[in-house]
């Protein structure tokens, strides 16, 4: 019993040490493995103190001989920002006690700033980090960048050719339903063939992979890119080729399904309208039936009253 207990205790200690090591490694690398990752850390900069500083910068009027903020470099912007915030006067003076009261509710998101004295100024560009983006500039540039990914305006769905994926179906004049069934049969057939390839010894061979031009470049730049880097040789096997073919088939199926989204939305809207019409018809039929029942009841009451009046008259 004691030996078994010691073994379990030792296993628990080992598991705890392993979990601590993993936690320490994750904290060191700052990698989030959560299914719902936390928001970007830029939200910590939106404190009440920084927003007050931003109001001071926006209320400051530049002299005629001073260049605009957009013409300054990053270092020059920080120097001007610190110079404006250090100016004495009521417009640039922030009461420390008032700031402490205002930031008491935001202590959870300002753990790193709480240890700093209130006289410390931000070490980042307030106008660049806290001001909302300029919509005119976004429309002029034709898109915006979020977390390193470019989103064009209006939103444009890239074609399979632009993604470097071969098109496995004719582009025009074909029923998409039949195309999806054909691609599904191709996927199943390729899956059966790849199971047979796994039972045979691998025989690698070299294939030429052509380069795909960058769709964001101009045609002249694309030609220059293809001239300098037309492609490369790589080693592959039949199993790898079939696996790549299966991936291309799945992407083609997804692309066709996405093209059917407007049709699906249209048919769904038709179905909803038909359901609403049928419900209105059922409600109208129910009302008519109730009205007919009430009329019949009223007629019965009239007949009963007529018979009673005849009986009283004859008596």
From Swiss-Prot:
One MF term in the entry's GO annotations: transcription coregulator activity
Domain of life (superkingdom): Eukaryota
Keyword annotations of the record: Activator, Nucleus, Transcription, Transcription regulation
Pfam families: Med7
Record flagged with keyword Iron-sulfur: no
Region annotated Disordered, chain positions: 1-36
One cellular component (GO) term of this entry: core mediator complex
Family to which this protein belongs: Belongs to the Mediator complex subunit 7 family.
Protein name listed in UniProt: Mediator of RNA polymerase II transcription subunit 7
Gene source species: Mycosarcoma maydis
Gene giving rise to this polypeptide: MED7
